């Protein structure tokens, strides 16, 4: 049974968030956490927070299962564009430039690994 966590209205551009989301897509949860901890991108904090929430949601949905981070993997992660705030910046000769402050919605779906690899 899969679990989902959504982080909405994050004040980061979707393009920057997709860079971090691509790093952890399809990885096991423990490996994804290690990647996010060592990432220098500011969006990695939001992805880490949402990933922890998805793992907690999995534990709530499946209370009889004891699952570690090694047994879970990120089934899907996608970033959608949120609302765009439009602001103006004064420009020379009485003009104004438009600034678009973008936001995004992050969705992470985790699931249990079907055939865990044993070493």
Curated annotation (Swiss-Prot):
Alphabetized UniProt keyword annotations: Ribonucleoprotein, Ribosomal protein, RNA-binding, rRNA-binding
Any one of the GO BP annotations: translation
GO molecular function terms listed in the Swiss-Prot or TrEMBL record: rRNA binding; structural constituent of ribosome
InterPro entries, alphabetized: Ribosomal_uL22, Ribosomal_uL22_bac/chlpt-type, Ribosomal_uL22_bac/org-type, Ribosomal_uL22_sf
GO CC annotation terms, alphabetical: cytosolic large ribosomal subunit
Role, per record: This protein binds specifically to 23S rRNA; its binding is stimulated by other ribosomal proteins, e.g. L4, L17, and L20. It is important during the early stages of 50S assembly. It makes multiple contacts with different domains of the 23S rRNA in the assembled 50S subunit and ribosome. The globular domain of the protein is located near the polypeptide exit tunnel on the outside of the subunit, while an extended beta-hairpin is found that lines the wall of the exit tunnel in the center of the 70S ribosome.
Family: Belongs to the universal ribosomal protein uL22 family.
NCBIfam families associated with the record: rplV_bact (TIGR01044)
Subunit structure, as described in the record: Part of the 50S ribosomal subunit.
Protein's recorded name: Large ribosomal subunit protein uL22
Organism field: Chlorobium phaeobacteroides (strain DSM 266 / SMG 266 / 2430)
The gene coding this protein: rplV
């Amino acid at each position: 049974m899969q679990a989902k966590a959504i982080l909405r209205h994050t004040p980061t551009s979707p393009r920057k968030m997709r860079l971090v989301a691509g790093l952890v897509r399809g990885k096991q949860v423990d490996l994804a956490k290690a990647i996010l901890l060592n990432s220098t991108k500011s969006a990695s904090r939001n992805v880490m927070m949402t990933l922890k929430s998805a793992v907690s949601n999995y534990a709530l949905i499946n209370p009889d299962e004891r699952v570690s981070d090694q047994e879970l993997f990120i089934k899907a992660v996608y970033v959608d564009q949120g609302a765009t705030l439009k602001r103006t910046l004064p420009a020379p000769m009485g003009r104004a430039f438009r600034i678009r402050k973008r936001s995004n919605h992050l969705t992470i779906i985790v699931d249990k690994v079907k055939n865990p690899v044993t070493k």
